[in-house]
Design a protein with these regions (language model features):
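A mature extracytoplasmic/lumenal domain signature
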Residues: 148-152, 172, 180-182, 241-243, ...
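Short, solvent-exposed, Trp/other aromatic-anchored flexible loops in extracytoplasmic proteins
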Residues: 337-379
Length: 397
């Protein structure tokens, strides 16, 4: 099978948000799950993957240095790469996403100039930063949805942080607004009430400002634009509020998820996720060089890190909702701190496989893969034996 690989000149840059810390995943004694190249193709009647979509968001970082070699400014952003059923739709989404990324360059150039003018040679200088990172939150036949963070640092005690999102109709490639996903514009009021109900439950935890209800109602006013204030996940429709919007900065970004079970009659039927039979397989990782790719009826190829090697992911039966998250370890090596999701796919089976170009270390894994089976969400680290070249998935327990 002829494989087509798009190489992007990019490198994944780890980003940790101080005001919106990810959950800490305790380190575990890794249990190697060896690759099994003997798996033979068959039919995936176990839990057929009718939709075989994938999306990666490889990152790139640009640096600006002073004449004396001091880092003045760094600008981090992403490309997007996807494989879905309709190439024209894929191209349309890609062009829109990249245009949004390109529109941030003017801000980056402005901050870079501020850094040039502010640098005085002091040993206490801290580099200015402008980081924009998206994570795919739902990728399927209904929608392509991503949620991101924007971090700006120009000196001071902490960076300024904001949230952003983009959602596309997976059938047409159209950028979706809130009004475009609801059955009727009046449904904004219904959604507003659902969000307020959720926030009421969170008030004790977040110490929301007095009168926050009015801020939320203004957000959902039918005459106001809320195009970029929502995104989809596999479990619901999410709405978010930036630091200072509803609560003190230390609270970080506040996210409210409305489960799909609360949205019949409100959300357009086209944007509900399909129901599917739970998968019962296990994920298998193997060097693509040692795999017989011809045994797969469908093969998807995407890039995470262009300097890496090709790794093939497939299953003995099938698994669903694969996500790969970049991260780093605490200095004591006890906790893995996830940064952001860099890859998402509907799943793999013994007929459908994914080849990813990625870097896999032999120690201190920095990529975690998760997927869904009938037993729930499974989490593993990627690890490589540099002596044999074998790739293993190490269980996170």
């Amino acid at each position: 099978m002829r494989r087509i690989l798009i190489i992007l000149l990019c490198a994944i840059f780890a980003l940790s948000l101080a005001a919106c810390q990810p959950d800490k995943t305790p380190a575990a004694q890794p249990t190697p799950i060896p690759s099994d190249p003997s798996i033979q193709p068959g039919n995936d009647e176990d839990a057929p993957l009718h939709t075989f979509y994938g999306l990666s968001v490889p990152g790139q970082v640009e640096y600006l240095y002073s004449d004396d070699g001091i880092l003045l400014f760094e600008y981090a952003y992403q490309h997007i790469q996807m494989q879905i059923a309709d190439q024209n739709v894929s191209d349309k989404i890609t062009l829109d996403f990249l245009s949004r990324v390109d529109s941030t360059r003017a801000n980056a150039d402005s901050i870079a100039q501020q850094a040039r003018e502010s640098y005085d040679g002091s040993t206490t200088w801290s580099a200015y930063k402008y980081h924009i990172y998206y994570s795919p939150t739902r990728v399927d036949q209904g929608v392509i949805s991503l949620f991101g963070t924007r971090t700006t640092y120009t000196g001071g005690t902490h960076p300024d942080q904001g949230a952003l999102s983009v959602t596309y109709d997976a059938a047409t490639g159209e950028y979706l607004t809130l009004g475009g996903i609801l059955n009727h514009v009046d449904n904004k009021e219904d959604v507003c009430e659902l969000v307020l109900d959720k926030l009421e439950d969170l008030d004790y935890q977040y110490s929301l400002f007095d009168g926050y209800e009015n801020i939320v109602k203004d957000r959902f006013n039918a005459d106001e634009s809320t195009d970029e204030a929502f995104y989809f996940t596999n479990s619901g429709l999410c709405f978010y509020f930036a630091p200072y919007e509803l609560a003190p900065f230390s609270t970080g970004i506040i996210t409210v998820e409305i489960p799909y079970s609360d949205l019949p009659g409100i959300l357009n039927d086209a944007y509900f996720p399909d129901e599917y039979q739970p998968a019962t397989g296990k994920l298998i990782a193997q060097s693509a060089d040692s795999a017989d790719t011809n045994k797969f009826a469908q093969l998807m190829e995407l890039v995470l890190q262009p300097e890496g090697e090709e790794v093939i992911l497939y299953s003995d039966k099938s698994v669903r909702n694969i996500k790969i998250t970049s991260g780093s370890w605490t200095p004591d090596g006890l906790y893995f701190l996830p940064d952001y999701v860099i890859f998402s796919a509907t799943g793999v089976s013994n007929e459908k496989a994914i080849i990813l170009r990625m870097s896999i270390p032999d120690i201190h894994p920095d990529l975690m893969v998760s997927y869904e089976t009938v037993d729930g969400v499974q989490n593993y680290y990627f690890l490589k034996n540099n002596e044999t070249g074998a790739i293993a998935l190490l269980s996170v327990e």
